[in-house]
């Protein structure tokens, strides 16, 4: 079973995504902000996948994505960005920073499943 971490400050959206990930046979852990997720990473725990919201208080999903990709020990973990922000500029920025997939809210399970498969596929190809 794959371990997925959702980092999203929207509890309702988190619950919906969590349900979708469980249907896709993922063990899910949720963080309401990037700081505790980063601390958990630094303490040695690792997911097999990140699902990151972009707009969050304190540390944005983009900033957390940059943190993940800068660290040698985290940079190969697949990342799916999940946001209501669907501008080409934001999508291009996230992808340029190393996101493996970008999904806009509201999300259908098929779309999330495809993004997760894409992220895992990109991760395997890059190892």
PLM region descriptions:
Residues 30-49:
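Acidic, metal-coordinating helix/loop segments flanking the phosphotransfer/catalytic sites
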Residues 14, 57-58, 87, 106:
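The feature encodes the CheY-like receiver
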């Amino acid at each position: 079973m794959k371990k997925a971490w959702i980092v999203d400050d929207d509890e309702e959206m988190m619950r919906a995504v969590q349900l979708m990930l469980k249907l896709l046979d993922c063990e899910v852990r949720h963080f309401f902000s990037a700081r505790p997720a980063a601390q958990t990473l630094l303490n040695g725990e690792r997911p097999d996948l990140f699902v990151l919201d972009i707009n969050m208080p304190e540390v944005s999903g983009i900033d957390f994505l940059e943190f993940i990709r800068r660290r040698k020990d985290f940079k190969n973990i697949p990342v799916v960005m999940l946001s209501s922000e669907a501008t080409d500029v934001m999508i291009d920025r996230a992808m340029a920073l190393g996101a493996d997939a970008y999904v806009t809210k509201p999300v259908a399970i098929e779309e999330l499943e495809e993004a997760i498969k894409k992220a895992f596929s990109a991760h395997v190809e890059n190892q």
